[in-house]
């Protein structure tokens, strides 16, 4: 009896399996082209591909662009902050006090907030319009990462700094109204989400308070 490897067995005896795999790949490709769902395998080249897709999404913004990432860093600002193409848009970033208080590995005397503030100040001198907001709290009240582009919201499987370096996904939220409203609510409430420059002045004060009011607790169906 001839010996067949598992791969050869499926090719010879289960041709329908190959057809299914081909159809599955076509379907995933169509989702990727429409920016509905994209899977990144974590291979070495995937990180640069993931970064390029995020930059493309940011560049497509015509009305608003908000990046929500509790670990948003100086590196992310320099990589993504310059990719808004519309002069009418202020790129808004929401990050967390918990991360900004942490030390920088390569610069142990500096905090993440210090170097992010310096980079933001430098970009502002080149007329790049970016505002950064800081969610207060000893622990970040924000866990997931998402990007608002006009009336769309895209969920990221990891923070921008590592996006694509391991297996992860980008997913367009079917009904984004709640997340858009939540991001806007954070930005408007300076008591829980001040601008970075304001937070820098008082960063050792009040950040340990609870964040009981930080989430919009209404049902999604109640939000217009």
Where do the model's predicted regions map?
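Short, solvent-exposed loop/turn at the beta-strand->alpha-helix junction
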Residues: 72-75
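PLD/PLD-like phosphodiesterase catalytic module centered on the HKD motif
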Residues: 1-50, 77-224
């Amino acid at each position: 009896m001839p010996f067949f490897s598992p791969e050869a067995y499926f090719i010879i005896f289960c041709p329908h399996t190959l057809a299914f795999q081909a159809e599955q790949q076509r379907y995933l490709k169509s989702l990727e082209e429409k920016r509905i769902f994209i899977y990144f395998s974590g291979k070495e080249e995937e990180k640069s591909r993931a970064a390029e897709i995020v930059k493309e999404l940011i560049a497509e913004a015509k009305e608003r662009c908000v990046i929500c990432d509790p670990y948003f860093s100086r590196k992310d600002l320099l990589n993504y902050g310059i990719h808004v193409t519309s002069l009418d848009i202020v790129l808004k970033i929401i990050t967390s006090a918990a991360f900004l208080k942490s030390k920088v590995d390569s610069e142990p005397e500096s905090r993440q907030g210090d170097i992010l503030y310096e980079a933001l100040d430098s970009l502002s001198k080149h007329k790049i319009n970016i505002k950064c907001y800081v969610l207060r709290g000893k622990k970040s009240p924000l866990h997931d990462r998402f990007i608002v582009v006009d009336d769309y919201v895209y969920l990221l499987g990891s923070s921008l700094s590592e996006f694509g370096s391991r297996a992860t996904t980008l997913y367009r939220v079917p009904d984004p109204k709640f997340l858009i409203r939540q991001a806007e609510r954070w930005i408007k409430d300076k008591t829980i989400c001040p601008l970075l420059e304001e937070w820098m002045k008082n960063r050792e004060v009040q950040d340990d308070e609870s964040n009981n009011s930080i989430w919009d607790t209404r049902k999604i169906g109640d939000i217009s």
